[in-house]
């Protein structure tokens, strides 16, 4: 995304590796990206993601900022982070209960190794996809009431 009206903070650059300068030079207009994303999301019957509620809030805020309706709010969705707390059983720092697993932690639990390029959008999508299908295959998750409801 090309920054328009904001600057990418250095802390964010350290996480995902995209500097403000790189985004200015190589980024795409956010309206174009949102239009493509919303068309794809509109053609799907289920949104799947890791920490999906965060992503839906960020995209929803951008939709509203651009003058669009936030139709993602009511879209059926499945979060691999929220649904695998008991599966991963990673102790919470407070000592009570379990914490939400990071995508890398879930991936390691399922496949015994890390995936590369953490915080790279394409790598995160691929890892989430792989985790979702492995969890479904194992019967660990049931994203809908019936597998017949899945569109794939």
Where are these predicted regions, by residue range?
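Ser/Thr-centric signal marking residues that sit
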Residues: 13, 80, 84, 128
């Amino acid at each position: 995304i090309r920054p328009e009206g904001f600057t990418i903070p250095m802390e964010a650059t350290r996480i995902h590796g995209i500097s403000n300068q790189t985004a200015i030079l190589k980024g795409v207009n956010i309206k174009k990206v949102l239009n493509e994303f919303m068309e794809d999301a509109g053609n799907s019957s289920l949104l799947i993601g890791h920490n999906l509620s965060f992503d839906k809030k960020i995209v929803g805020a951008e939709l509203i900022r651009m003058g669009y309706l936030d139709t993602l709010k009511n879209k059926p969705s499945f979060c691999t982070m929220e649904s695998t707390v008991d599966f991963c059983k990673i102790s919470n720092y407070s000592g009570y209960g379990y914490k939400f697993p990071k995508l890398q932690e879930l991936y390691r639990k399922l496949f015994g190794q890390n995936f590369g390029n953490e915080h790279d959008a394409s790598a995160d999508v691929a890892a989430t996809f792989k985790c979702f299908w492995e969890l479904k295959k194992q019967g660990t998750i049931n994203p809908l009431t019936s597998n017949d409801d899945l569109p794939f």
